[in-house]
A protein has these predicted regions:
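Acidic/His- and Gly-rich active-site-bordering loop/insert found
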Residues: 2-119
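Metal-dependent amide/peptide-bond hydrolase catalytic core
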Residues: 2-5, 197-392
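Hydrophobic face of alpha-helices
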Residues: 14, 18, 42-46, 103, ...
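Buried hydrophobic packing segments
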Residues: 45, 49, 102-110, 135, ...
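Short Gly/Pro-enriched turn/cap motifs at secondary-structure boundaries
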Residues: 58-60, 129, 162-165, 311-313
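Histidine/acidic-residue-rich, glycine-tolerant segments that coordinate divalent metal ions
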Residues: 65-68, 85-93, 97-98, 104-106, ...
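Non-cysteine beta-strand/loop elements that form the S-adenosyl-L-methionine
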Residues: 79-81, 176, 330-334
Length: 392
């Protein structure tokens, strides 16, 4: 009788749990919840792991919608990151329901082979990826301290094995002036909305001088409440992105000058507050990414060639913070979205369609087989364990 390999066993587990995983994906999709408010999604995601015998730690780092569920006691601790927050107004247009379900599928598959491979499987529920930096907060809380390597996937319109992302920071800028009647005594007012306008004009002019890879985008979240009242308070929210964290910091310094210009020109006071932890750029582990690429090909997928991956436009993710700390991957698994891209309503609909269901199942298998390959490679296993020891 032929020997059943660990990879085959893991794949069989995913096939056996297909119905549960797709049901989880659809259930999360049907009840979208925003950052730090994903209570139902968090509970659903950890439930399948708990039923399998995972030891669940609720609310690590004091985050109510985070969790860590562990199985096994091997020295090679593998973190599998689940996301489940949605977007305001358009639900799961980033497909985090697929991410959560594939993370659970990967964890269940690896639990079946954990003892034989010397693994500890750590399913980590990470809230607030869209805004809030849940993974960055969990890193600060020590949740990743014992993790040797971390994996997750993200849906998208194409397959990318070694996905990149942009570094990101987000700030809220509040201008405080003085109210007055806009017709009777406008000269007694200090117009906070004008400060916003000056800042936006300065930012618009700055865009001509931005370095390659730098970009910024923002919204006015408060600008007055009545046309006959000089606005005494106005507020902006801006995101700054760049190819790496150093370039992002340089952009942020220049943006702060634009914000200050609004205050100086109008006489307003101003305050800049970081809206969330900064997101670092993804640094995919090359060995893990190449194994995942081979798994994509084995599944009949056609990943973007390695030599053009860096040129594929992407957003930002707090998984970048994880991959800057330890070996990890964040591949993109393609689904048929009818031409829509993430953060469009068309992608919301696609994220619960047949192609999305296929991504859940195939993604679970590909991630699980990639981890098995790591565990079975003495050289790579030693490498990631040595890197973890160096962090201690």
């Amino acid at each position: 009788m032929p020997t059943i390999t660990a990879s085959t066993r893991a794949e069989d587990v995913v096939a056996a749990r297909r119905g549960d995983l797709i049901e989880l994906s659809h259930s999360i999709h049907a009840e979208p919840e925003l950052a730090f408010d994903e209570h139902r999604s968090c509970a659903k995601t950890q439930a399948l792991a708990a039923d399998r015998g995972f030891a669940v730690t609720a609310a690590p780092g004091g985050l109510p919608t985070a969790f860590r569920a562990d199985y096994g006691s091997g020295p090679l601790v593998i973190g599998i990151c689940a996301e489940y927050d949605a977007l305001p107004g358009i639900g799961h247009a980033c497909g985090h329901n697929i991410i959560a379900a594939s993370a659970v599928g990967t964890a269940l598959a690896l639990a079946d082979v954990a003892d034989g491979l010397g693994l500890t499987v750590a399913l980590i529920g990470t809230p607030a990826e869209e805004s809030g930096g849940g993974k960055a907060l969990l890193i600060e809380a020590g949740v990743f301290d014992d993790v040797a390597a971390a994996v997750m996937l993200h849906p998208g319109p194409i397959d990318i094995a070694a996905a990149r992302s942009l570094a990101l920071s987000e700030v809220t800028v509040t201008y405080t002036g003085r109210e007055s009647h806009a017709a009777v005594a406008p000269y007694l007012g200090v117009n906070a909305a004008d400060a916003v306008t000056v800042a936006q004009v300065a930012i618009g002019l700055l865009r001509q001088q931005l370095a390659p890879g730098q970009m910024t985008h923002g919204i006015v979240t408060e600008g007055g409440s009545a046309t006959n009242v000089i606005p005494g308070r106005a507020r902006l929210q801006y995101t700054m992105r760049a190819t790496d964290s150093a370039s992002r910091r340089a952009l942020e310094d220049r943006m702060r000058g634009c914000f200050e210009a609004g205050a100086v020109a109008t006489g307003c006071a101003y305050e800049i507050v970081e809206a969330a932890p900064a997101y670092a750029e993804l640094a995919p582990d090359r060995w893990l990414a190449e194994v995942f690429r081979a798994e994509m090909v084995r599944m009949g997928r056609a990943p973007v060639p390695a030599d053009v991956e860096a040129g594929v436009p992407l957003g930002s993710t707090d998984m970048g913070n994880v991959t800057q700390l330890l070996p990890g991957i964040h591949p993109v698994v393609g689904i048929d979205a009818g031409g829509a891209v993430i953060h469009q309503p068309g992608f919301t609909a696609a994220a619960a369609g047949p192609s999305a269901d296929q991504a859940v199942i195939e993604g679970s298998i590909m991630l699980a087989r990639t981890v098995v390959a790591l565990a079975e490679s003495p050289a790579e296993r030693d490498r990631v364990l040595a890197l973890k020891a160096d962090r201690a």
